[in-house]
Amino acid sequence: MGHCYSRNISTVDDDDEIPSATAQLPHRSHQNHHQTSSSSSIPQSPATSEVNPYNISPFQSPLPAGVAPSPARTPGRKFKWPFPPPSPAKPIMAALRRRRGTAPHPRDGPIPEDSEAGGSGGGIGERLDKNFGFAKNFEGKYELGREVGRGHFGHTCWAKAKKGKIKGQTVAVKIISKSKMTSALSIEDVRREVKLLKALSGHSHMVKFYDVFEDSDNVFVVMELCEGGELLDSILARGGRYPEAEAKRILVQILSATAFFHLQGVVHRDLKPENFLFTSKNEDAVLKVIDFGLSDYARFDQRLNDVVGSAYYVAPEVLHRSYSTEADIWSIGVISYILLCGSRPFYGRTESAIFRCVLRANPNFDDLPWPSISPIAKDFVKRLLNKDHRKRMTAAQALAHPWLRDENPGLLLDFSIYKLVKSYIRASPFRRAALKSLSKAIPEEELVFLKAQFMLLEPEDGGLHLHNFTTALTRYATDAMIESRLPDILNMMQPLAHKKLDFEEFCAASVSVYQLEALEEWEQIATVAFEHFESEGSRAISVQELAEEMSLGPNAYPLLKDWIRSLDGKLNFLGYAKFLHGVTVRSSSSRPMR
């Protein structure tokens, strides 16, 4: 499932100078959790260079064998620490050990007590319940064939249905060994994966779920057979990268699936080229996302904190142990970067080195082939790979990006709109006035997206009421959305039951200050917004009142004084910009919009 484990390598120090020795790159490992991949030989890229002897990470390179990634792709910066730095890989390795139920590495000292070694359930002397309540008659319904893939918990086989609605149809059967389920976490992962596959199966870019069975030794998950191989194999077959036009077609499919399961309150947590399969070997084959073994529910009012995923694709906030659906967007940004240039945006010789690059280094957009790639494509990738998760586009916003617009990707409801509107109606009148001024300075490209979202909510008489938000969410609801409790946000939007949002106020409620700050024209946007605020919404405000607006204490008074003009007691430009950015939304118990 996740692959953030590491090898014990004592001979290479991350901060040492690189010697000039050479060695063979490791072969690309086919550890597909679902289907087989093409085994045809990969053509040699014309842009080959000396073989990199330090590609010793177990995470497989997206480059063809013999192609060394340029050190300039991720600058080889020297991170100087007064003491040896803590390894960012340790939390991931520890989390995966807990899920798999495996013991930690041997250490000096006494043998740990049972409670210490047992992880999260399933310790010594504790009997795990591995009965899932699934049907038992797998062999009566399916004829099992050859193995087509293998992963940590089990393997995937070709099979043929002997009876039922899909009689005679070939399917893929993921066989998960119960002997590998040695912790309560690993058992819960399997249960949740099956639940998610059932709930999300209807989308055109989600692998279809057919059935699930079990016996005393295994769980059998019956799914659609995708015979076109992994996206990673397709990248390799093209010499390491996709032409821009083809990359767009791939990314639209990835984002379409992601926008769908994000709307259901699901975060995948392991998006990478190996977890996307083509339905056939045809050029126009549909791409489908697989492997929800590490996925979880992302409730609107909570952040996840367990560190899982694959090293090259893990988001900075995952390493900081506070993340949600935005972490998947980062992973798609890494995939986008690889598709367009054939190199990883972050590279290291060990997992710890990779994670330090993820946290500190910036992707390189100057070396070849980036000068030949369109500026709008680079803007797209940069807006996915923003280290501040609040400034990243959502999957629905990415589908509306100008670079993808000619692909006619269609639009899905963006749940971030609900969170922003909820915050708006719970904000103070002064905060709402500031946002209304900002909405009048929104660039045309951003207005296109907001207009589309407004229409998806099906306004009546030019405005939106609470029931418009309720109906729209119900239209897209699956069992996964119910499990993630996303509809609970509607209880916090009750003030809309007695008020209508027209499009102008909807824009004020739905605009993300952080995402606007990520735009190159942010200073111009803020200047125009401040002019509107000066003429329409500004008023005199005391330091104490401003501190209360921003949930700050008396210690902040000296700082806030610089934000208020002494002449008339109103916010100056700096104060307005900081006020928009700061912690301004009151708690859910604050007074609703009047």
Curated annotation (Swiss-Prot):
Ca(2+) 2 binds at residues 500, 505. The active site is at 270 (proton acceptor). Residues 408-438 are annotated as: Autoinhibitory domain. Ca(2+) 3 binds at residues 538, 545. It catalyses: L-seryl-[protein] + ATP = O-phospho-L-seryl-[protein] + ADP + H(+); L-threonyl-[protein] + ATP = O-phospho-L-threonyl-[protein] + ADP + H(+). Residues 34-49 have a biased composition (Low complexity). It is a lipid-anchor. Transmembrane segments: none annotated. InterPro entries: CDPK_Ser/Thr_kinases, EF-hand-dom_pair, Kinase-like_dom_sf, Prot_kinase_dom, Protein_kinase_ATP_BS, Ser/Thr_kinase_AS. Keywords: ATP-binding, Calcium, Kinase, Lipoprotein, Membrane, Metal-binding, Myristate, Nucleotide-binding, Phosphoprotein, Repeat, Serine/threonine-protein kinase, Transferase. A lipid is attached at residue 2 (N-myristoyl glycine). Residues 1-126 are annotated as: Disordered. Residues 445-480, 481-516, 517-556, 557-586 form the EF-hand domain. Autophosphorylated. It is an enzyme of class 2 (transferase). Residues 427-447 are annotated as: Calmodulin binding (CaMBD). The modification Phosphoserine is found at residues 310, 352. May play a role in signal transduction pathways that involve calcium as a second messenger. Binds calmodulin (CaM) in a calcium-dependent manner. There are 3 contiguous domains conserved in the CDPK subfamily: a kinase domain, an autoinhibitory (junction) domain and a calmodulin-like domain. The autoinhibitory domain (408-438) inactivates kinase activity under calcium-free conditions. Belongs to the protein kinase superfamily. Ser/Thr protein kinase family. CDPK subfamily. PANTHER family: SERINE/THREONINE-PROTEIN KINASE (PTHR24349). This is CDPK-related kinase 6. It comes from Arabidopsis thaliana. The lineage of its organism: Eukaryota, Viridiplantae, Streptophyta, Embryophyta, Tracheophyta. The gene is CRK6.
